[in-house]
């Protein structure tokens, strides 16, 4: 015989079980007065052997179940229908009660009203719930009863403890045995008395009180936060102003680069002029120099042609060094320098003093010097000192 179940057979078994469960759950509850043999579902007749009209219905279980429950006693458990749910014969039962089974495989159902009898659908649901409860209670271990602990004293057990007998604790069902208690065989009292340790709790209880009020320093913290917020806003305003001047800074950089380019061009032109005219100017006009180069004294000794001599200036003169010249040069007169307008420069220097000088004493000293200045050189010196003090 093949010990392995095929996949098709497993699927058929699962489908059959689901059909049986759906049949039990979907079967309507009939309100008949009695349970006839025609209403019994095929397959559960051995369980329902006996007269269904009796008040107490007892059904023996299978032989293998009875052999396992012989040592546990023959207990009988009952299901009691409350009077509120009891009625006349033929009434519909809204919710069937759980049927309980006792030891020995005996199922007993007790009704307070003899007129109410279970119908076929009720018994079907009852049998289904009996099997479910058996499967659940199969793995539940019954509570154990511990034997009292005898008090141990020096010199052996007391007179009251001598008459007590210790019985081994049995277990009713599957599970490990807790063992048996035995008295100490030592009568010398070498082993001291030890108290029984109490069971430990899962958690230690804690006292719950009213939550404390707000701390006193909360107001100080709020004031500090407000101050920090104000400082942050002030810094943000300054940063916004700095960012707003970004375009102006870019424009200043462009103008500065233009000025540097122009200055480099001027320096190149000045170097070219110095190369072309390395001498020092004397202040004599160019026409005068050309005329002095062209006019010269010619001495004719003896007869000869004197037609080449100029007849415009026949008279010669002697200069300061007794040199013969055709005409004495007029004395050089110094031209008076034009008086420049210094009012505009004074206004500019006054503005520089106001913007660049922060020290009140230095500002007053510059204003006094500006009032006394009457030449351009004095104004330039004042302007130079203002720039140095600002740096």
Swiss-Prot record:
Residues with PTM Phosphoserine: 69, 188, 257, 292, 294, 301, 374
Region (Disordered): 54-98, 148-184
Phosphothreonine: residues carrying this PTM: 10, 16, 91, 150, 165, 250, 258, 282, 298, 375
Region (Multimerization): 216-279
Coiled coil: 218-245
Region of interest called Interaction with the nucleoprotein, as start-end residue ranges on this chain: 343-391
Keywords annotated in UniProt: Coiled coil, Phosphoprotein, Viral RNA replication
InterPro entries associated with the record: P/V_Pprotein_paramyxoviral
Pfam (any one): Paramyx_P_V_C
Ranges of compositional bias, category Polar residues: 54-65
Phosphoprotein among keywords: yes
Disulfide bonds: none
Highest taxon above the source species: Viruses
Function text: Essential cofactor of the RNA polymerase L that plays a central role in the transcription and replication by forming the polymerase complex with RNA polymerase L and recruiting L to the genomic N-RNA template for RNA synthesis. Also plays a central role in the encapsidation of nascent RNA chains by forming the encapsidation complex with the nucleocapsid protein N (N-P complex). Acts as a chaperone for newly synthesized free N protein, so-called N0, allowing encapsidation of nascent RNA chains during replication.
Free-text note on domains in this protein's UniProt record: The N-terminus consists of a long intrinsically disordered tail. The central part contains the coiled-coil multimerization domain (MD or OD). Forms a four-stranded coiled coil structure. The C-terminus constitutes the alpha-helical X domain (XD) that binds to the nucleocapsid (N-RNA complex) and the L polymerase.
Subunit structure: Homotetramer. Interacts (via multimerization domain) with polymerase L; this interaction forms the polymerase L-P complex. Interacts (via N-terminus) with N0 (via Ncore); this interaction allows P to chaperon N0 to avoid N polymerization before encapsidation. Interacts (via C-terminus) with N-RNA template; this interaction positions the polymerase on the template for both transcription and replication. Interacts with host RPS6KB1 kinase; this interaction may play a role in the viral replication and transcription.
Family: Belongs to the rubulavirus/avulavirus P protein family.
Name of the protein in its database record: Phosphoprotein
Organism field: Mumps virus (strain Enders) (MuV)
């Amino acid at each position: 015989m093949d010990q392995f179940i095929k996949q098709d057979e497993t699927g058929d078994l699962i489908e059959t079980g689901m059909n049986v469960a759906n049949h039990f759950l979907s079967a309507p509850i009939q309100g008949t007065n009695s349970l006839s043999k025609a209403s019994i579902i095929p397959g559960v007749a051995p369980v329902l052997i006996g007269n269904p009209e009796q008040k107490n219905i007892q059904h023996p279980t299978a032989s293998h179940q009875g052999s396992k429950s012989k040592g546990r006693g023959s207990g009988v458990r009952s299901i009691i229908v409350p009077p509120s749910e009891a009625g006349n014969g033929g009434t519909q039962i809204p919710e069937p009660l759980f049927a309980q089974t006792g030891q020995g495989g005996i199922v007993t159902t007790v009704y307070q009203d003899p007129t109410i009898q279970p119908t076929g659908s009720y018994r079907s649901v009852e049998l289904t719930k009996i099997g479910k409860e058996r499967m659940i209670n199969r793995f539940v271990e019954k509570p154990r009863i511990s034997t009292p602990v005898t008090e141990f004293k020096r010199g052996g057990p007391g007179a009251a403890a001598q008459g007590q007998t210790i019985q081994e604790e049995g277990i009713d069902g599957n599970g490990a045995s807790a063992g048996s208690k035995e008295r100490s065989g030592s009568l010398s009292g070498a082993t001291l008395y030890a108290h029984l340790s109490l069971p430990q709790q899962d958690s230690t209880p804690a006292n719950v009180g009213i939550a404390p009020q707000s701390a006193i320093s909360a107001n100080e913290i709020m004031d500090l936060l407000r101050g920090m917020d104000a400082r942050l806003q002030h810094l943000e305003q300054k940063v916004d102003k700095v960012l707003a001047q970004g375009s102006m800074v870019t424009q200043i950089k462009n103008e500065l680069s233009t000025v540097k380019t122009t200055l480099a061009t001027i320096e190149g032109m000045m170097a070219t002029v110095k190369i072309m005219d390395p001498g020092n100017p004397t202040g004599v006009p160019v026409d005068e120099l050309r005329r002095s180069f062209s006019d010269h004294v010619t001495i004719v000794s003896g007869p000869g042609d004197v037609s080449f001599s100029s007849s415009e200036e026949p008279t010669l003169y002697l200069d300061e060094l007794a040199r013969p010249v055709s005409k004495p040069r007029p004395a050089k007169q110094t031209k008076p320098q034009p008086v420049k307008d210094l009012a505009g420069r004074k206004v500019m220097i006054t503005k520089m003093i106001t913007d660049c000088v922060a020290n009140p004493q230095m500002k007053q000293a510059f204003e006094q010097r500006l009032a006394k200045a009457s030449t351009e050189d004095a104004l330039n010196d004042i302007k130079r000192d203002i720039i140095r003090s600002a740096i």
